[in-house]
């Protein structure tokens, strides 16, 4: 049985990689895993929770652990692996690709890093150390196509979220499971899946919720907490407010549980406040209006502003080419501004409807369903025939 090492460093990567692993069951798969990968039987060499970071300051605090996980991963590659698949997370994964290349192991980059945001500096490194790059965003083709050769192949497969997003509740059943009165409107508060995001952004969102309750008496706030962040979320929530925390079926906490809690919130909330990341594209696909918030340490923001080559942070805005979803970043990521922007959407029907129309355009631009199946077929061909 051929062996695959699968490396992810973020919860969103775990989401994609677990679906990919389901389509490659004929192979033995190990790697750096998240909760969904572990739940379907991918054997962990290490856990993504140990290496998932945002920004320079958090990376420094976890440097020793990241170095240890990298060493463990290289040892696993040396023990006999036929294929390395890495998912986004370039700071770690590009180095791992280089080690695999030295060992003569075939390599796949599934979901390119955001080279279009950070400039082309990493493109050459990726091309030199990747046999097959599988892209999920349509505009990446023009970046990589000039580099295609016998040694580097590129394929655009469409976006996996079109297959992954499944919603099981309607508004009535969702409210019933959460004991929310029918006459209440749900507002989603999505603070991210990383410790630094929950620590910094969640308290801001909760204070924004408190401000909104002064204007509206019919709002109920729902926070979907990832398995790895449930305890941290519960520590920060002010339960004197109309707030409910929900989590995943994978959690052992005594909370309302759903297969994909974030999706249920995005679908059944009239409006959501969402931390920048993959969740913003998930929300765009689901189609209910939202705003994007983000805040990092001043030094991380300063460095990012110098390096980033794009005008927007949120993926829906990058794809659309303009700010169809308001972005409240850094100093604007504060309770008053967030509450005021939310109030605008709750009181202006035209604003609300316009964003819904724009989100539908973004969704249609992401291609057709079947991305994971197309990706797994490409990987299977590379493994069995030695070429993509």
From Swiss-Prot:
GO molecular function annotation: lipid-A-disaccharide synthase activity; phospholipid binding
Keywords, alphabetical: Glycosyltransferase, Lipid A biosynthesis, Lipid biosynthesis, Lipid metabolism, Transferase
Swiss-Prot/TrEMBL catalytic activity: a lipid X + a UDP-2-N,3-O-bis[(3R)-3-hydroxyacyl]-alpha-D-glucosamine = a lipid A disaccharide + UDP + H(+)
Enzyme class: transferase
EC number: 2.4.1.182
Protein's GO biological process: lipid A biosynthetic process
A GO cellular-component term linked to this record: membrane
Pathway this chain belongs to: Bacterial outer membrane biogenesis; LPS lipid A biosynthesis
Disulfide bonds: none
Superkingdom per UniProt: Bacteria
Family indicated by similarity: Belongs to the LpxB family.
Role description: Condensation of UDP-2,3-diacylglucosamine and 2,3-diacylglucosamine-1-phosphate to form lipid A disaccharide, a precursor of lipid A, a phosphorylated glycolipid that anchors the lipopolysaccharide to the outer membrane of the cell.
UniProt-listed PANTHER family: LIPID-A-DISACCHARIDE SYNTHASE, LIPID-A-DISACCHARIDE SYNTHASE, MITOCHONDRIAL-RELATED
Listed name of the protein: Lipid-A-disaccharide synthase
Gene: lpxB
């Amino acid at each position: 049985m051929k062996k695959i090492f699968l490396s992810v460093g973020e919860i969103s990567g775990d989401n994609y990689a677990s679906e990919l692993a389901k389509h490659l069951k004929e192979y033995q798969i190990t790697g750096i895993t998240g909760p969904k990968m572990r739940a379907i039987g991918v054997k962990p060499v290490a856990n993504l929770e140990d290496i998932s970071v945002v920004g320079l300051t958090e990376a420094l605090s976890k440097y020793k652990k990241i170095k240890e996980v990298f060493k463990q991963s290289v040892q696993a590659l040396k023990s006999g692996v036929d294929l390395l698949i890495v998912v986004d997370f370039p700071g770690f994964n590009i180095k791992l690709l280089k080690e695999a290349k030295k060992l003569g192991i075939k390599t796949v980059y599934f979901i390119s890093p955001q080279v279009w945001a950070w400039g082309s500096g990493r493109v050459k490194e990726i091309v030199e150390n990747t046999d097959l790059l599988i892209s999920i965003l349509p505009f990446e083709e023009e970046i990589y196509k000039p580099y295609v050769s016998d040694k580097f192949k590129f394929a655009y497969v469409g976006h996996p979220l079109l297959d992954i997003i499944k919603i099981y509740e309607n508004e009535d059943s969702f409210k019933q499971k959460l004991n929310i009165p029918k006459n209440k409107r749900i507002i989603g508060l999505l603070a991210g899946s990383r410790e630094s995001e929950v620590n910094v952004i969640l308290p801001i969102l909760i204070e924004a919720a408190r401000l909104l309750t002064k204007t509206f008496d019919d709002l109920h706030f729902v926070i979907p907490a990832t398995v790895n962040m449930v305890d941290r979320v519960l520590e920060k929530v002010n339960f004197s407010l109309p707030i409910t925390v929900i989590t995943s079926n994978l959690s052992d906490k005594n909370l309302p549980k759903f297969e994909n809690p974030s999706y249920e919130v995005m679908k059944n909330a009239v409006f959501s406040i969402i931390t920048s990341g993959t969740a913003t594209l998930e929300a765009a696909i689901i189609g209910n209006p939202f705003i994007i918030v983000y805040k990092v340490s001043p030094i991380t923001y300063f460095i990012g502003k110098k390096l980033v080559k794009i005008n927007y942070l949120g993926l829906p805005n990058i794809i659309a080419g303009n700010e169809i979803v308001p972005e409240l970043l850094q100093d604007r990521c504060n309770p008053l501004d967030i509450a005021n922007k939310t109030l605008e959407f709750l009181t202006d029907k035209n604003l609300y409807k316009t964003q819904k129309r724009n989100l539908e355009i973004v969704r249609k631009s992401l291609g057709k369903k079947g991305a994971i199946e197309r990706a797994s077929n490409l990987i299977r061909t590379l493994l069995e025939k030695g070429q993509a």
